[in-house]
Amino acid sequence: MKSKIALSCEKCKIKNYKTNKSIIERLELKKFCSRCKEHTIHKEEK
């Protein structure tokens, strides 16, 4: 079953991306943050 999650920037804590995931582990991706204007680590938020 896929669950809906939000990805938030580790630096500024803004929620930039929404996605679905089907794995159990917490998701952590390097994505572009529009507020920081750079690629940062984005972690999963519920």
Swiss-Prot record:
S-S bonds: none
A Pfam family matched in the record: Ribosomal_L33
Gene Ontology cellular-component annotations: cytoplasm; ribonucleoprotein complex; ribosome
Record-level GO BP terms: translation
Key words, A-Z: Ribonucleoprotein, Ribosomal protein
Origin superkingdom: Bacteria
Database matches in Gene3D superfamilies: Ribosomal protein L33 (2.20.28.120)
InterPro entries named among the record's database cross-references: Ribosomal_bL33, Ribosomal_bL33_sf, Ribosomal_zn-bd
Family: Belongs to the bacterial ribosomal protein bL33 family.
Protein name, entry field: Large ribosomal subunit protein bL33B
Primary gene name: rpmG2
